[in-house]
Amino acid sequence: MNNRIPEDLIERAYQGKSTKEDGLLLLEVPPFELFRFADELRSLTAGDTVTYVVNRNINFTSRCVGTCGFCAFRTNDGKVLSIEEIMEKVREAEKAKATEVCIQGGLLPDVGLDFYQEIAESIKAEFPEMHIHAFSPMEVYHASHISGIKVSEALSKLKRSGLDTMPGTAAEILSDRVRKIICPSKLRTAEWIEVVTQAHAAGIPTTATMMYGHVETPEERIEHILTIREIQKETGGITEFVPLPFMPYNNPVGEKIIREGRYATPGLDDLKIYAISRILLHGHVDNIQASWVKLGKKLSQFALQCGANDLGGTLMEESISRLAGAPNGESISVEELEWMIYGAGRVPKERTTLYKGVRELASRNPGRITGCGASE
């Protein structure tokens, strides 16, 4: 194990030029040395502000023709929400002062792009200020093929219908070796990259994710992060990077690795991923999000000391992680998020999906919270 981070690696990180070899070496650095450097870069980029968004997740169907081995959400005959049922959830979100609705669902066998356009158009007609963060690259790819149009045309249509941004989900690990094992029917690495870069070209920013902790190697994790960096260097359209630990429960891939004696990734490994993501993406992707749903509330707080500067959203509902065994709930209040952030020694700030400030929440602070969680 290397006791210190080499000076030349530090210099490359500051310049935004970290290499694959740097990423692999960082895996061998003592954890708290790694966390300290990632936190230093986080401070340079984001200061002591930790952001979150008031949003609502809407999963409009679990019905899906996909065959992803990691999914506990998919069904063959799940209900598909009607436009009116979706709109009722949007109305509830608006009453809760949400600024964003995040809408995704399974891959429907006979539903083309028109349905997705109708969702966006209905929301914008009633709530023109509501930000629509919706439809994964896989959903767009699937719907465009059913409709017999190019992905670029589908994205242009969705943009005109009111789609504001797109989740960078369905990325899993951007390695075709891995994808053939865990999601053989899903779009290949090059196809995912194409959908995302075409979304950026159409004026639709995206997030980017990485689902890790299943069959991938350490090298494939590092390569995934560097692939995201290359996309960002080309387009500048990625708003945040979200590492997502795999939930190995109630799904075939998870059942297999549990039989092999492995379980969910250890918390220390999760924190290393956040730290290495911050270091490799420094100067390119400013925002690293810690998913409280996946990590849990306490480990998410610790991730804020390891490179993360965002805690995601209030959600209101979340089915996919819950069904895969995530025990951390589906909804969180603004007040609890603020409490968590102060408890980590940081200053909370509500943001929009595009990381514009909505309002500072310091006025709600019941008493300054130190990094150890004690009130002064």
Swiss-Prot record:
Pfam families: CofH_C (PF19288), Radical_SAM (PF04055). Pathway: Cofactor biosynthesis; coenzyme F0 biosynthesis. Keywords: 4Fe-4S, Iron, Iron-sulfur, Metal-binding, S-adenosyl-L-methionine, Transferase. Its EC number is 2.5.1.147. Gene3D superfamilies: Aldolase class I. It catalyses: 5-amino-6-(D-ribitylamino)uracil + L-tyrosine + S-adenosyl-L-methionine = 5-amino-5-(4-hydroxybenzyl)-6-(D-ribitylimino)-5,6-dihydrouracil + 2-iminoacetate + 5'-deoxyadenosine + L-methionine + H(+). It is an enzyme of class 2 (transferase). Residues 50-284 form the Radical SAM core domain. [4Fe-4S] cluster binds at residues 64, 68, 71. GO terms for molecular function: 4 iron, 4 sulfur cluster binding; 5-amino-6-(D-ribitylamino)uracil--L-tyrosine 4-hydroxyphenyl transferase activity; 7,8-didemethyl-8-hydroxy-5-deazariboflavin synthase activity; iron ion binding. Its cofactor is [4Fe-4S] cluster. Binds 1 [4Fe-4S] cluster. The cluster is coordinated with 3 cysteines and an exchangeable S-adenosyl-L-methionine. The keyword S-adenosyl-L-methionine applies. Consists of two subunits, CofG and CofH. Catalyzes the radical-mediated synthesis of 5-amino-5-(4-hydroxybenzyl)-6-(D-ribitylimino)-5,6-dihydrouracil from 5-amino-6-(D-ribitylamino)uracil and L-tyrosine. Belongs to the radical SAM superfamily. CofH family. This is 5-amino-6-(D-ribitylamino)uracil--L-tyrosine 4-hydroxyphenyl transferase 1. The gene is cofH1.
